[in-house]
């Protein structure tokens, strides 16, 4: 569950390290974001000399959450951190690599590019 003011790690090589969620995009008054949801975030920490700078407003898709996610089979999956991948307006990732595992729910939400870049899909 990602809400406003939540800090997330960045799971790609776009240049940002930490994000803070400003808004969860969705229908109506979306308070919490789950895996596969798009958020508006501000970059709180960035690597020097990279295209994405600190205090820049970006779009990102949530790829890992500490809150357990229930699947239709009854199994639940939980990750060690909250993480997101920065995307452009078309929904494609800005980075060329994705670090760490991502959830299978991303494939259902048509983020196949992120799933193909990830080293492991759980």
Swiss-Prot record:
Gene3D superfamilies: Ribosomal protein L14 (2.40.150.20). One of its GO terms (biological process) is translation. GO terms for molecular function: large ribosomal subunit rRNA binding; structural constituent of ribosome. Disulfide bonds: none annotated. Belongs to the universal ribosomal protein uL14 family. NCBIfam families: rplN_bact. Binds to 23S rRNA. Forms part of two intersubunit bridges in the 70S ribosome. PANTHER family: 50S/60S RIBOSOMAL PROTEIN L14/L23 (PTHR11761), LARGE RIBOSOMAL SUBUNIT PROTEIN UL14M (PTHR11761:SF3). This is Large ribosomal subunit protein uL14. It comes from Rippkaea orientalis (strain PCC 8801 / RF-1) (Cyanothece sp. (strain PCC 8801)). The gene is rplN.
